């Protein structure tokens, strides 16, 4: 009997109700090409194969090959890619949707890799606490860097809370099925790399004002504290709206506010040759 590997974070989804919930949430048609990350025993893969034109499955664990071979005997629209999902070049795969029970230890990096690649819709399984942070609104305890990094690029919603009993082996925590739809055009991010550095800097001190957070985390933007103080003094003189935002506590700013502030700060630094 196959034993899931702890080091790979393997918790196989075995409850057919939640498999169906994930597939239904993806609104699949016979025109859709789906990417799945993590084969497991193929229970989700089979439902995807029934409902989509083609299914790509990325799986790192070759010991699951018997399950893969059995599925490929039954369905001719499944292609298995043996490898690490974080290393596979997703641009070489022509999928438009993603449905997966993600290994939880790669939740964050694989989510942003997928968003960068682009897709029409994703339905992904996460730890429930992680999912709550993804959908959190400003002013709440779960609102943080992850919330803004995701919501500035996609609309997210929790579709279902999933109990440990839905998996084998049972994890110690609840999970959640999350629907993600890229929101291209909703927010304009001037420079993606700068924006991510800006988020890292300010959310290290989420309970402080943006001004204090930027000074205390100035190294994230490659400045020392004295340089950042001087830069912010000059920046504050640009307009009154910026002054209000920069003196507000980080966790109270909306996604829109943070995107706008990051863009203004980026342009300010660029115009003065400080980048």
UniProtKB/Swiss-Prot annotation:
GO terms of molecular function: RNA binding; rRNA (adenine-N6,N6-)-dimethyltransferase activity
Enzyme Commission numbers on file: 2.1.1.-
Localization (cell): Cytoplasm
Superkingdom classification of source: Archaea
Cross-referenced PROSITE patterns: RRNA_A_DIMETH (PS01131), SAM_RNA_A_N6_MT (PS51689)
Residues at which S-adenosyl-L-methionine binds: 13, 38, 59, 84, 101
CDD domains: AdoMet_MTases
Pfam families recorded: RrnaAD
Gene Ontology BP term (one): rRNA methylation
This protein's UniProt keywords: Cytoplasm, Methyltransferase, RNA-binding, rRNA processing, S-adenosyl-L-methionine, Transferase
Cellular component, GO annotation: cytoplasm
NCBIfam families cross-referenced by the UniProt entry: ksgA
Similarity comment text for this entry: Belongs to the class I-like SAM-binding methyltransferase superfamily. rRNA adenine N(6)-methyltransferase family. RsmA subfamily.
Function: Specifically dimethylates two adjacent adenosines in the loop of a conserved hairpin near the 3'-end of 16S rRNA in the 30S particle. May play a critical role in biogenesis of 30S subunits.
Protein name, entry field: Probable ribosomal RNA small subunit methyltransferase A
Organism listed in the record: Methanocaldococcus jannaschii (strain ATCC 43067 / DSM 2661 / JAL-1 / JCM 10045 / NBRC 100440)
């Amino acid at each position: 009997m196959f034993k899931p590997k702890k080091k790979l974070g393997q918790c196989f989804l075995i409850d057919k109700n939640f498999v169906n919930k994930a597939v239904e949430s993806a609104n699949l048609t016979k025109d859709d090409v789906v990417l799945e990350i993590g084969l497991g025993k193929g229970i989700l893969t089979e439902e995807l194969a029934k409902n989509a034109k083609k299914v790509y499955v990325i799986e790192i664990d070759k010991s699951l090959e018997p399950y893969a071979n059995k599925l490929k005997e039954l369905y001719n629209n499944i292609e298995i890619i043996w490898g690490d999902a974080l290393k596979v070049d997703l641009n070489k795969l022509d999928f438009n949707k993603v449905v997966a029970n993600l290994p939880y230890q790669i939740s964050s990096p694989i989510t942003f890799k997928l968003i960068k690649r682009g897709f029409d819709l994703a339905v992904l399984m996460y730890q429930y606490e992680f999912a709550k942070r993804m959908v959190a609104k400003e002013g709440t305890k779960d609102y943080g860097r992850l919330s803004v990094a995701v919501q500035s690029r996609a609309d997210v919603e929790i579709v279902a809370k999933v109990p440990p009993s839905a998996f084998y082996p049972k994890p110690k925590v609840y999970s959640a099925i999350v629907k993600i739809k890229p929101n291209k055009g909703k927010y304009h991010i001037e420079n993606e790399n700068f924006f991510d550095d800006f988020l890292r800097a300010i959310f290290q001190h989420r309970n402080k004002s943006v001004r204090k957070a930027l000074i205390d985390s100035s190294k994230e933007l490659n400045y020392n504290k004295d340089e950042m103080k001087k830069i912010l003094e000059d920046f504050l003189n640009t307009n009154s709206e910026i002054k209000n935002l920069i003196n507000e506590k980080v966790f109270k700013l909306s996604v829109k506010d943070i995107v706008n502030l990051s863009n203004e700060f980026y342009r300010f630094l660029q115009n003065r040759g400080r980048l």
